[in-house]
Amino acid sequence: MTTIRVKDNEPFEVAMRRFKRTMEKTGLLTELRAREFYEKPTAERKRKKAAAVKRHFKRLRGQMLPKKFY
């Protein structure tokens, strides 16, 4: 359970922003969304493999030399 302590004279918006940041760091919302519906093991493997391929090509694209313009 994520908790934050609201400081004296702290605006609500600032406290809410801090709470959202801590929730994002823990990864609780992403896990909750993933567990909302059952996902078959084959579908999970397929999704994870596609994500790995996407990360690989993204990394390669960052290492490529720029094209020469002439």
Curated annotation (Swiss-Prot):
InterPro entries associated with the record: Ribosomal_bS21, Ribosomal_bS21_sf
Keyword terms of this UniProt record: Ribonucleoprotein, Ribosomal protein
Cysteines joined through disulfide linkages: none
Assigned GO CC terms: ribonucleoprotein complex; ribosome
Pfam families in the record: Ribosomal_S21
PANTHER family the UniProt entry points to: MITOCHONDRIAL 28S RIBOSOMAL PROTEIN S21, SMALL RIBOSOMAL SUBUNIT PROTEIN BS21
Protein's name in the database: Small ribosomal subunit protein bS21B
Organism the protein comes from: Paraburkholderia xenovorans (strain LB400)
Recorded name of the encoding gene: rpsU2
